[in-house]
């Protein structure tokens, strides 16, 4: 064997033992002819000392990230020279011999000094990701991810779930984003699609009688690279038969609780639930951050008779910034720029003086009665600032929801180590297709309505009879789990009856012919005794990034893409050669379906 011990596991109890270590030169220091090296392996660092004149002379040539094999005797460090920051800080290894297993070229950035990480551009870090991952904080992120995988599997295995892999080459079916397409060389002009989720296959597994399925699944979505998204990502995918919403939520809480124990945090269960309508009304978001107690107050009725033109709108709402009246004018102007960057015209405000008097542009334009009652209506105290949004309900609530988050940051209301979880239930089943496209999503079908979650979500039982006649009122049998303002998982009770699924497609403008072409296999399966079933999928990259305290999911993915979907390490995506293009049949016209099927049958017969 190349080594007898691991660097980070040596302790005082090992004193006097002869050991052989392997690892990288983390740091080298010369002191009067004696050379000290911090030798790093996956477990940590051990200080190795080259005192012997022969080995010390050779050690002068060692540089950062050289790969070494050293043999020596473990000794307790002299009094006063211990390093409390290292697990092995009470000992050092006096080297008797060593071997250079490999040298290192000059580094593009320093690895041993973690404080320099912020000075290194992300493109450089990703281009040399194999070096970036030598830094303990990055390596530990991947180990945390592995531990989270294990914790989830332990919970699911204890409930008799079966881990099953579903295809990653399938047909293109509309699911809410654009597909990544893969040319099928043996069928020129035709394409596979990489799955956006295992949704349809996991439902088919329920029809197959597997009852309890899970998978740590790779998923692919060809979408614009908005904030902190990846074209390929991982989700913990779970599906089970003969369950209702409460069953799935209970299992989801057990999984999340076990995973959060990895960082020493005990989640109180059951996790509170909040309706989608309440979340939007109180927090302006369907993924509210509940670590701070700032709520939106609706003022539409309060200003119903106002003479102020700005407040003569579909919706008027407000949030209060405690102590905000003391903000200087430049800060209040900055709020206006902040709002404009979010597509609003501005952020109206009233300042409540310490004497209770109101000031600011809005205060001058509202009636005496409105001035007398507005502070009490929104719960503002002397010294506070009241911010308003007015306009259509959706965009106004979104602006106020963002404002409450910005207020929390400015007032330092979010404390490190705080966690707030909630379930969001009773979301709308459908939304206007125009709203979906405006937010950057793909509106499925050819109707003015599209699914909020996906086309396979069941309506709540009370809407089963009329969701297609009143799609705007129908609520979905769906549930999302939110942590600190991040949606970390979502699921639903699924449709398991063919006629209901066809009615949903019809609402979305998916014709019977199109449904049979793209989803015929699912509709056919529903005809053979499909059980009631439901499930949930957790965004695994997001969960691990939250656990590790990372700002970006890229930090918890071994080889992530940059913000533009580029891999700086391999320079993917890349052009292909004309020969590859020809072989892949990218430009070929697909044969008529009947002809292609006949050829396939002929080939199959020939093989037999």
From Swiss-Prot:
Q: Where is this site: Important for tRNA non-discrimination?
A: 31, 80
Enzyme Commission code(s) on record? 6.1.1.23
Q: Name one GO molecular function term.
A: nucleic acid binding
Q: Which GO terms describe its biological process?
A: aspartyl-tRNA aminoacylation
Q: Which reaction does it catalyse?
A: tRNA(Asx) + L-aspartate + ATP = L-aspartyl-tRNA(Asx) + AMP + diphosphate
Key words of the record: Aminoacyl-tRNA synthetase, ATP-binding, Cytoplasm, Ligase, Nucleotide-binding, Protein biosynthesis
SUPFAM superfamilies referenced in this protein's UniProt entry, alphabetically: Class II aaRS and biotin synthetases, GAD domain-like, Nucleic acid-binding proteins
Compositional bias (Basic and acidic residues): 580-596
Q: Does the keyword Ion transport apply?
A: no
Q: Where is the major localization of this protein? A: cytoplasm
Q: Name one GO cellular component term.
A: cytoplasm
Q: Which positions in this protein are listed as binding L-aspartate?
A: 175, 221, 453, 494
Residue numbers spanned by region Disordered: 566-608
Q: What is its biological role?
A: Aspartyl-tRNA synthetase with relaxed tRNA specificity since it is able to aspartylate not only its cognate tRNA(Asp) but also tRNA(Asn). Reaction proceeds in two steps: L-aspartate is first activated by ATP to form Asp-AMP and then transferred to the acceptor end of tRNA(Asp/Asn).
The family note in this entry says: Belongs to the class-II aminoacyl-tRNA synthetase family. Type 1 subfamily.
UniProt cross-references to PANTHER family, sorted A to Z: ASPARTATE--TRNA LIGASE, MITOCHONDRIAL, ASPARTYL/LYSYL-TRNA SYNTHETASE
Quaternary form? Homodimer.
Q: This chain belongs to which protein, by name?
A: Aspartate--tRNA(Asp/Asn) ligase
The record lists the organism as: Corynebacterium glutamicum (strain ATCC 13032 / DSM 20300 / JCM 1318 / BCRC 11384 / CCUG 27702 / LMG 3730 / NBRC 12168 / NCIMB 10025 / NRRL B-2784 / 534)
